[in-house]
Amino acid sequence: MFSNIKDRIRLLFRKDRESYLRFYKMLGFYPKDISIYEQALLHKSLSVKSEKGRLLNNERLEFLGDAILDAVVADIVYKRFEGKREGFLTNTRSKIVQRETLNRLAIEIGLDKLIKYTARQSSHNSYMCGNAFEALVGAIYLDRGYRACKYFMEHRIIGPYINLEKISRKEVNFKSKLIEWSQKNRFEVTFELITQSHDQGYNPTFESEVLVEGISGGKGTGYSKKESQQMAARVALGKIKNDSGFIECIFAAKTARELPQEEVTVSDSKPSDSGAVTPDLSLEEIKKTDVVEQIISEAEEKAFKENA
């Protein structure tokens, strides 16, 4: 896909050619701007200041890579499984881009050995490798564009490390997915058993409810407590994706919980004002979600036009 002849010639005259070769072995092509890739490997615990005084780490690239990765995997899955319904495609994509899978892939390609971080941070962040993988995809997108991202995922990741047929048949663990989302975004999630009864055949049934920041995310029923929690988590994930009102409520609740205790005490002494809990922050977070969706849509549209 890529012509590396000119890049190889330039490489002979570079002092940092070892870094270029390291990324070439991982990506299958040479970086144009290696500094972007180096930033993708810089954890926030070792942030550095730019000439303009802005802190540099891989968080912004992780944000971008998360969106691009969703689009690329959706593109690949859509074309691989012709005739399959939207639900099947969504679930298959979710299994590939979930944090557990990304952590494993990062280790498989040796990305974990290149991440720069403090020793203390490594023991407290089990998602560091997966986050760096997303940041790497963001770096590829900025440096080489969407086609390079798709090439990387198809030929360097999915080909060697992921069996699409097998992973498409794997059952989705909605509860784990919700907990993973909550941990990454620092939301409090709890499951409560509401009722326990029997159906007409005297089989035990359970109804559970999931609460996100104390707000009901959904209810689910099943023939075991575990199954009812899975169904409730599935409803909550749907709300997180599609219900803007629910998103605004849980962001406001999270903001109120994270306020310093003295500020909460002062606000409690004043008359209540509906919707007055730091709306700027919640709107900022919501705008971030809108940007993600916009990037995904634009990237998918571009990909389908290029491959039409």
From Swiss-Prot:
Entry binding sites for Mg(2+): E62, N131, E134
UniProt protein name: Ribonuclease 3
Cell location: Cytoplasm
EC class (word): hydrolase
Gene Ontology cellular-component terms listed: cytoplasm
SUPFAM superfamilies found in the cross-reference section: dsRNA-binding domain-like (SSF54768), RNase III domain-like (SSF69065)
Domain of life: Bacteria
Family: Belongs to the ribonuclease III family.
Functional note: Digests double-stranded RNA. Involved in the processing of primary rRNA transcript to yield the immediate precursors to the large and small rRNAs (23S and 16S). Processes some mRNAs, and tRNAs when they are encoded in the rRNA operon. Processes pre-crRNA and tracrRNA of type II CRISPR loci if present in the organism.
EC number: 3.1.26.3
DRBM domain location: 173-242
Listed Gene3D superfamilies: 3.30.160.20, Ribonuclease III domain
Domain RNase III: 20-145
Cited PROSITE patterns: DS_RBD, RNASE_3_1, RNASE_3_2
Self-association and partners: Homodimer.
CDD domains named in the record: DSRM_RNAse_III_family (cd10845), RIBOc (cd00593)
GO biological process: mRNA processing; regulation of gene expression; rRNA processing; tRNA processing
Reactions mediated catalytically: Endonucleolytic cleavage to 5'-phosphomonoester
Keywords tagged on the record: Cytoplasm, Endonuclease, Hydrolase, Magnesium, Metal-binding, mRNA processing, Nuclease, RNA-binding, rRNA processing, rRNA-binding, tRNA processing
UniProt-annotated catalytic positions: D66, E134
Classification via Pfam families: dsrm (PF00035), Ribonucleas_3_3 (PF14622)
Obligatory cofactor(s): Mg(2+)
GO molecular function, one term: metal ion binding
Annotated spans, Disordered: 261-281
